[in-house]
């Protein structure tokens, strides 16, 4: 018997990431090749943005995707989020010239407070929310705090791009395929302070740390390369990473919904105090997923070097959280 369609909301739907994302969702890459979807697409109520969204929708129609059971354009989150099962919050206020980080936090706090309230009011009670728009962890925290009637664990932030970037760097360093790398994960904020950790990682059962055995490379090449990759792409392409961000969003939601079969991945999720991270901080953790639920991998030893790295990214997140507290 055919499955009932799942409703998927995407914000910033006419943007670069939206354009790289929507066709893949409609093709079944995110929720499964047997799962029909209805796309509920949100853009700002600006004539140009709405017109661009219509153009993207025309292209999606022209793909004649068998799994696409419906599609609507919206300018109001209260209608866009109605009964949605998955919400991808991609649209965010980018940092403009001369804008301080505090200005950026407050501009985004307004957007994500409104979207959190709308999800709280009209989304499915089991909605799975992924925040992609930066600063992703803090935006996810704001949305979660603005939706008190939804389970807090339904709100997540995207650390999967950092995770995938780390995988590709390890693959390049070892000369092994990405698919052979297991147990690599990322702690903390989706920012240059994130801590990609391969101390437990293996390739074909062998320790990656022993294979590479180069703490200087780890500290001076690997971590800065992964942490500053977004800036390097802007420098090279003149635009921020869109296709790789869309790909990471698909990976994140697919694994959350369909399960990882015991494989460890990275998700930004609200802490319950694990590994000494204060409750409610939206933090990148190693997780496994099963039956639509994620579970933090517990019992990992955190050495002194790692403790220092985790503290740096936690301090940054605590600073961001303090910077928006008065807006909530």
From Swiss-Prot:
EC number: 1.1.1.37
Keyword vocabulary terms for this entry: NAD, Oxidoreductase, Tricarboxylic acid cycle
Alphabetical list of InterPro entries matching this protein: L-lactate/malate_DH, Lactate/malate_DH_C, Lactate/malate_DH_N, Lactate_DH/Glyco_Ohase_4_C, Malate_DH_type2, NAD(P)-bd_dom_sf
Annotated binding of NAD(+), by residue: 12-18, 108, 115, 132-134
Catalysed conversion reaction: (S)-malate + NAD(+) = oxaloacetate + NADH + H(+)
GO molecular function: L-malate dehydrogenase (NAD+) activity
Biological-process GO terms, alphabetical: malate metabolic process; tricarboxylic acid cycle
Pfam families: Ldh_1_C, Ldh_1_N
TM helices/strands, residue ranges: none
Transmembrane as UniProt keyword: no
Gene3D superfamilies registered for this protein in UniProt: Lactate dehydrogenase/glycoside hydrolase, family 4, C-terminal, NAD(P)-binding Rossmann-like Domain
Binding residue positions for substrate: 95, 101, 134, 165
Catalytic residues, chain numbering: 190 (proton acceptor)
HAMAP family in the cross-refs: Malate_dehydrog_2 (MF_01517)
Function statement: Catalyzes the reversible oxidation of malate to oxaloacetate.
Protein name: Malate dehydrogenase
Gene: mdh
């Amino acid at each position: 018997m055919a499955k009932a369609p799942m409703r998927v909301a995407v914000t910033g739907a006419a943007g670069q990431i939206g354009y790289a994302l929507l066709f893949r969702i409609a093709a079944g890459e995110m929720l499964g090749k047997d799962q029909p979807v209805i796309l509920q697409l949100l853009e700002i109520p600006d004539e140009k943005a709405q017109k661009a969204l219509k153009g993207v929708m025309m292209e999606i129609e022209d793909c004649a995707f068998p799994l696409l059971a419906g599609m609507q354009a919206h300018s109001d989150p209260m209608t866009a989020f109605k009964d949605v099962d998955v919400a991808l919050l991609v649209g965010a206020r980018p940092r403009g010239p001369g804008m301080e980080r505090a200005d950026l936090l407050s501009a985004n706090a307004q957007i994500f407070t409104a979207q959190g309230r709308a999800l709280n009011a009209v989304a499915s009670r089991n909605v799975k929310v992924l925040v992609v728009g930066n600063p992703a962890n803090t935006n996810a925290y704001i949305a979660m705090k603005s939706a008190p009637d939804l389970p807090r664990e339904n709100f997540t932030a995207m650390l999967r791009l950092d995770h995938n970037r780390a995988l590709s760097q390890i693959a390049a360093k070892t000369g092994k395929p990405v698919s052979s790398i297991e147990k690599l994960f990322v702690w903390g904020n989706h920012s240059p302070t994130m801590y990609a950790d391969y101390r437990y990682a293996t390739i074909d059962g062998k320790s990656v740390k022993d294979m590479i055995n180069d703490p200087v490379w780890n500290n001076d090449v690997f971590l800065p390369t992964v942490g500053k990759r977004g800036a390097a792409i802007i420098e090279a392409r003149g635009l921020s990473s869109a296709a790789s961000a869309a790909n990471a969003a698909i990976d994140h939601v697919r694994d959350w919904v369909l399960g990882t079969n015991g494989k460890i991945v990275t998700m930004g999720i609200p802490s319950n105090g694990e590994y000494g991270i204060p409750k409610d901080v939206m933090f990148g953790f190693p997780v496994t997923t099963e039956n639509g639920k994620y579970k933090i991998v517990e019992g990992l030893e955190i050495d002194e070097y790692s403790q220092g790295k985790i503290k740096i990214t936690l301090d940054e997140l605590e600073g961001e959280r303090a910077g928006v507290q008065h807006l909530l």
